Amino acid sequence: SWNLGRYQRRPEAFDDAQVRTLHWHFKWAVAVAGANPRVSKDKVRQLEASLEEFYRSGGASMHVVHGERASVAGLLGLEEEAAEELAAWRATHRDENADCEGCDPMRQVAFAYRTEAWELAVATAVPVLTGAVSCSVQPQTTQSLVLLPLLASGRPRAAWEAHLRSYREIRRNPKALISLAYHLEYLALVGRVDRGLELLRRHLSWL
């Protein structure tokens, strides 16, 4: 908030690279606030409105704004709102503020996961699962998220392979705690409780 206030008072003091960094930090702030139960819904809404105002003032695409709103709506259990924001997200063009092509689709995969639209989740994830797009956290992050969709849509072998490949990549990364949770859920559902307990014991220090 300090950097944003300084930019609003003296925009000429920021070069293009610093402004771009501010765009990214602001969208991350909205995501973190939305996931923190200690931050009130009203405060999150204020941040969303400020994000839109900031992006519009710089002529940025609303793609990121709609994407963040969709994610926050999902966290708040507002799936109709999430669906509307996702539709707007798909309809707006990506720009330099958007997540990479490997990570950006996770918004729709997450929505499909929450609403049990298993085929949509798998179809959205295909470019990442096939290696057509990737980054430092992909495909392993998406692989963990689609474990249940793969299983529920009748692809048990693909789910097991995704589990093995994803876990191999995340096992040394404490920042992948959420991904680990998907693996534990999957292992419980397929009756591999022994392996699930083994992974839980191995990663207790992440908690």
Predicted feature locations:
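Helix-turn-helix repeat elements of alpha-solenoid scaffolds
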Residues: 1-8, 35-50, 73-88, 112-126, ...
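N-terminal membrane-targeting/anchoring modules of bacterial envelope and secretion proteins
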Residues: 1-2, 6-32
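Solenoid-like repeat scaffolds
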Residues: 5-14, 50-60, 87-99, 126-137, ...
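Tandem amphipathic alpha-helical repeat scaffolds
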Residues: 20-37, 61-78, 102-115, 141-152, ...
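Alpha-solenoid helical repeat scaffolds
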Residues: 40-43, 55-63, 68, 77-87, ...
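N-terminal low-complexity, intrinsically disordered segments
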Residues: 133, 149-179, 187, 191
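Amphipathic alpha-helical protein-interaction segments enriched in hydrophobic
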Residues: 137-141, 174-186, 207
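Long, ordered, amphipathic alpha-helical scaffolds
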Residues: 181-207
